[in-house]
């Protein structure tokens, strides 16, 4: 079965429909890989092999009748921020403990309706707050990649680090992620895979545990953009249970791969040439411009003048929303519960014990910026600047079709290289946050390796609800980059 782990999601779909492989075979191979490798990677919080085998058996029965949806028999992993009916959902936090939702998130329900097989729930930064998957109550996730000159354990990025690591290592054919300020794109870049943050409102947030409600957006993570396109078409769609869901048709995203980019105007934001950017990141960015120019795109410099305010604005607006969203967790019904002599004391002690340090830091900051006397100075001002950031993008898109930037300011760093200053960690999102603040779609594609053999990604940012053009441009980069490298730890590599 060694060849099974060479499948992409698209090629596995085609093989299943042609009956060249059974869903049970495919699922068992991935379950075996998880059992073999995830003790080291720690990409899963909860595994569901028995349910997966039952679902695979049902998929084979459907396929034998010529039935089944677009994902029939495809083994996926689900970020443990999506509520899954009857399966533990933790948000990687002790405060949720062994919470088992009695309902299904819309995104996962859509995937199940199309026949997907869920292998389990994937690790993440606690409540999706982090850029390195180091804040999980269930331990850090290890990036399956290694540097050429070191055996140090690398971070997979965050917050969707478990999703990224599982896809990169071949433990799943695709995974769900969420992106609030870069949590799909940055880990995709760190692990050499593709990831799409759709337009805000494209995928329903119903049943997804909230971090920052005006920013959170679900999206796909997979080996390449074709696989991401297949997943996104299933995940997306209007949902009346989410007041921010937008009622607009979902295109056939996979068809966008054939569109080509001749005549496409690609904007290069001059403000993204940040001080101290490593030479190899700058060189990769220039290479990306060359690749697109070579297939007929036009490169145009643009200005996003409020870029420098992106991070501080994000860390005011997002943390304010987080402090409000996380106020509901009290330790009474589930999760970490600490006894106290009064009800208020129980709340305080349970929250102090149940939340990790990074989450508590963000709750404190968010509560402060919303407090009397500081609301106008911080939160209200941040919302006004956020509008200016969005206007920057709208103005740029009057002249160009997409924007091209690096995804992250570096490749993956070692787990023990974590900066002690949280602000330094927040800088990992410097290139991804502005698109989140504007609500526009963005994606990351693997484009090369750094000098130490670790993946680097390029980011494309698009117009509202124009994920198709992003996918077409991203596919052009994929074809030119020909990124076929495999990480050190991979299901297809013999132990």
Curated annotation (Swiss-Prot):
* GO cellular component assignments: glutamyl-tRNA(Gln) amidotransferase complex
Q: Has keyword tRNA-binding? A: no
Q: What's the superkingdom here?
A: Bacteria
What SUPFAM superfamilies does UniProt report for this protein, alphabetically?
Amidase signature (AS) enzymes
**EC top class named in words:** ligase
Q: Which Pfam families match?
A: Amidase
Write one Gene Ontology MF term.
glutaminyl-tRNA synthase (glutamine-hydrolyzing) activity
Q: Which InterPro entries match?
A: Amidase, Amidase_CS, Amidase_dom, AS_sf, GatA
State which Enzyme Commission number(s) the record gives: 6.3.5.7
Q: Does the keyword Nucleotide-binding apply?
A: yes
Q: What is catalyzed by this enzyme?
A: L-glutamyl-tRNA(Gln) + L-glutamine + ATP + H2O = L-glutaminyl-tRNA(Gln) + L-glutamate + ADP + phosphate + H(+)
Cited NCBIfam families: gatA (TIGR00132)
Please give the HAMAP family that the UniProt record associates with this protein.
Answer: GatA
Q: Its family? A: Belongs to the amidase family. GatA subfamily.
Designated name of the protein: Glutamyl-tRNA(Gln) amidotransferase subunit A
What is the organism field in this record? Answer: Gluconobacter oxydans (strain 621H)
Q: What is the lineage of its organism?
A: Bacteria, Pseudomonadati, Pseudomonadota, Alphaproteobacteria, Acetobacterales
């Amino acid at each position: 079965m060694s060849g099974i782990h060479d499948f992409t999601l698209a090629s596995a779909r085609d093989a299943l429909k042609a009956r060249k492989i059974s869903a049970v075979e495919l699922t068992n191979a991935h379950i075996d890989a998880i059992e073999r490798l995830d003790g080291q990677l720690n990409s899963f919080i909860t595994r569901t092999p028995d349910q997966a085998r039952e679902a695979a058996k049902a998929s084979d029965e459907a396929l034998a009748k010529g039935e089944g949806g677009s994902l029939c028999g495809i083994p996926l992993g689900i970020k443990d921020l999506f509520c899954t009916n009857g399966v533990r959902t933790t948000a990687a936090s002790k405060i949720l403990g062994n919470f088992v939702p009695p309902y299904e998130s819309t995104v996962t329900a859509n995937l199940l309706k199309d026949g997907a097989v869920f292998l389990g729930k994937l690790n993440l930064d606690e409540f999706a707050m982090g850029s390195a998957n180091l804040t999980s109550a269930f331990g850090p996730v290890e990036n399956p990649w290694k540097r050429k000159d070191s055996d140090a354990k690398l971070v997979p990025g965050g917050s969707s680090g478990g999703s990224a690591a599982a896809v990169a290592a071949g433990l799943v054919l695709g995974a769900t992620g969420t992106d609030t300020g870069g949590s799909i794109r940055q880990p995709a870049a760190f692990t050499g895979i593709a990831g799409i943050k759709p337009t805000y409102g494209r995928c329903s947030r119903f049943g997804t545990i909230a971090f920052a409600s005006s920013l959170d957006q679900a999206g796909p993570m997979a080996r390449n953009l074709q696989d991401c396109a297949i997943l996104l078409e299933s995940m997306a769609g209007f949902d009346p249970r989410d007041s921010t869901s937008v009622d607009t048709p979902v295109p056939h995203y996979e068809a966008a791969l054939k569109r080509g980019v001749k005549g496409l105007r690609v904007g290069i934001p001059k403000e993204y040439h940040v001080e101290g950017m490593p030479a190899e990141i700058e060189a990769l960015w220039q290479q990306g411009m060359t690749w697109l120019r070579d297939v007929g795109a036009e490169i145009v410099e643009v200005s996003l003048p409020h870029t420098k305010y992106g991070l501080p604005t994000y860390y005011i607006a997002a943390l304010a929303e987080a402090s409000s969203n996380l106020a509901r967790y009290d330790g009474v019904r589930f999760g970490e519960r600490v006894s106290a002599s009064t009800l208020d004391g129980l709340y305080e002690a349970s929250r102090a014990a149940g939340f990790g340090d990074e989450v508590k830091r963000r709750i404190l900051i968010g509560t402060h910026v919303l407090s009397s006397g500081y609301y106008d100075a911080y939160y209200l001002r941040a919302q006004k600047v956020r509008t200016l950031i969005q206007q920057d993008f709208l103005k740029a898109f009057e002249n160009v079709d997409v924007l091209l930037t690096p995804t992250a300011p570096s490749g993956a760093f070692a787990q023990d290289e974590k900066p002690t200053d949280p602000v330094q960690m927040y800088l990992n999102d410097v290139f991804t946050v502005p698109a989140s603040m504007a609500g526009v779609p963005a994606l990351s594609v693997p484009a090369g390796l750094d000098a130490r053999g670790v993946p680097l990604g390029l980011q494309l940012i698009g117009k509202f609800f124009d994920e198709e053009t992003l996918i077409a441009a991203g596919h052009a980069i994929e074809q030119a980059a020909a990124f076929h490298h495999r990480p050190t730890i991979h299901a297809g590599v013999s132990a």
